[in-house]
Every structure is written in C-alpha cells, then in structure tokens.
C-alpha cells in the first residue's frame, strides 16, 4: 500500500483532504478566505439553518418514509412533467439504482465515453452488454445501434461534469426513437440551471417529451441534498421494488426533505438569471484573454494536460485567493489534467473580473495562453 501511495505521489496523482468551510461564494481554508470557483451551488441559494429531525428510523420501505417524501416527489414529477418520481439519498445512488433496476443482463447499453463514473459503475453492475460511443458523436452512436439486435438503452449526461459541454440531445433523441431504444438522461448539472424555470437540458433543447428516464441531483442547482429519478409510473415502481441503493439504505432526514420542498417552492428565476449573466461574462472574459474552451455551461475547464503543471497552476490560483481544483487521472484521462471551475450566482462582477485577471496571469505564467 505504501508503494502505491508513493507511486501516486510521484505521478502527481495523490489526493489529500483539506479542512474547509463555506461562506456564500467563498471558501475558508486555514482561516483564510478565497473566492470559490469549485462550488456546485450554482444558483447560490444554500443558506440558513435546517430545522426538523436529523435522522429517519430506517429505510423508506420499513419505517423511514416521512410523509413529506410524497410531497417532494410530486413536485419533482411536476418539474419534469413525468408521472412519478422517487428520491434517493444521493445522485450517485440514483444512477446505480435506476440503471440496475431497468437494465437487464441480455440488454445492450450505449454509453457516452465521458459519462460520469456512477453511470459507468451502474452499467457494469447491471450485467448488460456495454457499448461505448464516441463523446457526443451521434453518427458513432447510430452505427453502433444499427449493428445490434436486442433491447437497447442509451445513457448520456445532459451537461458533462468535467467538460461543461451539452449533450447533442436533439440528434440523440431522434436516433433513440428511430431505433426503438430507451433513453436515460443524467441531468445532474443541467437540472434547475437550463430551460424554462430550470427544467433542464431536455427543456432548453425542446426534447423533454422524448426522454424516457430522468436521473438528477438535488445537491447542485437546487442547493439541497439527494438525488432522484422521474419517469413513467411503471419505471419508478420497478426501481422502488428492485433498486438496492433505495431498498437497503436509511432514508434521507426529514430536515433535508423539507429543505428541498422549500427550495422547489421558492422563486429561483432571479438567481438563475444572475447565474447566466455571470456565466456569459466569464466565458466572454476567458475568450478575450485567449483561453479556448468547449464549455457552454457553468462548468468551465481550463485544459492543462500535464498533471504537475495542473497542480502548480492550482497552487498559483490559491496563492491569489482563488480556489479552483485541479482535476487529474483517474477522473479524466492521463495527460488531460485541467482546472475545473464552476460559476455560481454568488459571484459578483468584481469577483469575476478579479478571477479573470488572475487567470490571465496564470495562463501566461504556465504558457497555456
């Protein structure tokens, strides 16, 4: 084990925990406040104390099914225009639970090569035959589907978590329909951010009705905690009965459920408009400086390549009171290390301008621009 740790350190891949606390759009490390460019609280609404009980007595199928779960799930179904929804303790568990419940051993799963690890693990656990298609490549997906006979599932993220680009859902939904496939969308980073009233990437691209199963998170755009799936009633009922990550785990605390209900019932549009104003300003600023990014969302990677250079880049930003994490293998491919930044509604114009100023200095210092 020590040898493995030494090798990780030599490869600039060793990860360490650091003690932090969050203050709106800032992060406090060693009693020093930094501008936080690594938050998933996109709308900037995660504030205040949470009341109610901090535990449930057991799993939801035993005695932990607080009455407010149903209220929350009805709100989520309305949000996604689906028949039924079910809440999981985390988004990761929602992916594991939904995919392993719906997909069977003799099925074929077509998964984008840059899908989140929770999707990858869920596909493996399902026992299905897995076909990986090139990232966001509708033609490659079509070719692979045409070569396959049997029940087919297509799984993609809406907004890709490490690149910030958006799935080619218009083409993918048409291909899915033409091949009689079942389309599963993980919209963890698009939900509550994109579309009318934050209904997600499917809504902004006009294909909501063509998506069969939605999987998403409550801990990002909604600023709460947990994950959920929304689909037709039979799909959700199957997950309730077969999903191990739902059946064999304690239910979320009532405090979290009530907090999520409060967030869903609040008017989030002002925060969402502020977020998009910040996103556009940051993208434009990066472009003016000379950075090239394929992102079209609040997730913006600066591609570095070399792992050590990415670590040094991150340390330089931190020295200027900006916190943005270097992302390395195995989260991304070797040689594709990056600084992954996420813009939120917390950020002020002054803070965005300062971040761009520091990023320009860092880009020139490390010969990225």
Cite the ranges covered by each PLM segment.
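Active-site PLP attachment segment
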Residues: 203-238
